[in-house]
A protein has these predicted regions:
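Catalytic strand-loop segment that frames the active site of acyl-thioester-processing enzymes
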Residues: 11-71
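Hydrophobic residues in beta-strands and at strand termini
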Residues: 39-43, 95, 143
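Hydrophobic beta-strand-centered segment that forms part of the acyl-chain substrate-binding groove
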Residues: 68-119, 135, 142
Length: 167
């Protein structure tokens, strides 16, 4: 994967320079541990046939992403309070096997790449025993100034500090 070199500057913001293959923490994302978020399929998650509706997967991915960031010390309410939002700007989902009413599974998520203010998150939903894979996805977030609606030039320091813990 190609991405910009990240370097920590004195005010703990991230600046970008030339493009080279680098990963947060210096390791390939395949080596990074997954954050695990349990899901249970309730009636409101399903369509008329008892199969999980495609939008439920997206909602679960957002819940898992918020909890993943919280586990690193970043509370979304704090990001909002300082005027930052992390909207989804790209989403790719591959549904591999349907989840059905009453099933339980694990949604795994991890940071795969950072380029400037853009973060790419990998997700997958697997059976509790890990033998079945139901869905894989990639979500791209961008840091935005909530008031102006413009992409930020650098990540907020609280987010930078959390991402540095991945190294």
């Amino acid at each position: 994967l190609q991405r910009r070199i990240l370097r920590k500057v004195s005010d703990k913001s991230i600046a970008t320079s030339r493009i080279v293959p680098v990963y947060p923490g210096g390791a390939d994302p395949g080596d990074r541990p997954w954050f695990e978020y349990p899901v249970c399929v309730y009636p409101h998650h399903t369509d008329y046939a008892g199969v999980v509706w495609h939008g439920s997967y997206i909602q679960w991915m957002e819940e898992a992403r918020v909890e993943y960031f919280r586990s690193m010390g970043v509370d979304f309410a704090q990001l909002v309070a300082i005027g930052c939002d992390l909207p989804v700007v790209d989403l790719s989902v591959r549904y591999q096997k349907p989840l059905q009413l009453g099933m339980r599974a694990i949604l795994k998520t991890r940071l795969a790449e950072i380029t400037g203010v853009r973060q790419i998150i990998q997700c997958q939903i697997c059976s509790l025993d890990g033998h079945e894979r139901y869905m894989t996805a990639q979500v791209t977030l961008v840091a935005v100034d909530r008031q102006r609606g413009k992409v930020l030039r650098k990540l907020p320091s609280m987010l930078v500090d959390a991402l540095m813990t991945l190294s």
